[in-house]
Design a protein with these regions (language model features):
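Conserved active-site-proximal phosphate/metal-binding subdomains
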Residues: 1-128
Length: 128
């Protein structure tokens, strides 16, 4: 009896085909196991992210609030440590030191850029 499918996302961030900014991809490659942490997002849900300078400042309450975009009804700007919209836009634009870098538990296992076809080849059954 074997698996009929798997769900993966993190593994494909560090592929040539992924349209994420190169600095975002490099953050995964540079991450160590202890850099992957559970964070509380401004919307009240926990998430897994890379502990970068932004997240360190957020934990210390050192990120000033700008204008609220009213993008998420559950967000309470007066109680949140940072604006999730700005943090995610920074990630998209490659400003990784000012970004929330969501990731999976095994993001630290990415060691290089590779092609999707090579990752998929790893899952092909071994003949014989």
């Amino acid at each position: 009896m074997g698996a009929s499918g798997v769900q993966m996302a993190t593994r494909f961030v560090t592929t040539y085909e992924c349209d994420a900014d190169e600095a975002y991809k490099q953050s995964y490659i540079d991450a160590k196991k202890e850099d992957i942490v559970i964070v509380q997002s401004p919307v009240g849900m926990p998430g897994r992210a890379i502990l970068n300078p932004f997240m360190k400042r957020a934990k210390e309450g050192q990120i000033p609030h700008g204008k609220c975009h009213l993008c998420i009804s559950t967000c309470k700007p007066e109680q949140t440590p940072y604006c999730i919209t700005e943090a995610l836009v920074n990630a998209v634009k490659g400003r990784v030191d000012k970004a929330l870098l969501f990731c999976g538990a095994n993001a630290y296992r990415a060691v290089k850029l590779e092609h999707v076809r090579d990752i998929m080849e790893e899952f092909r059954p071994v003949e014989g």
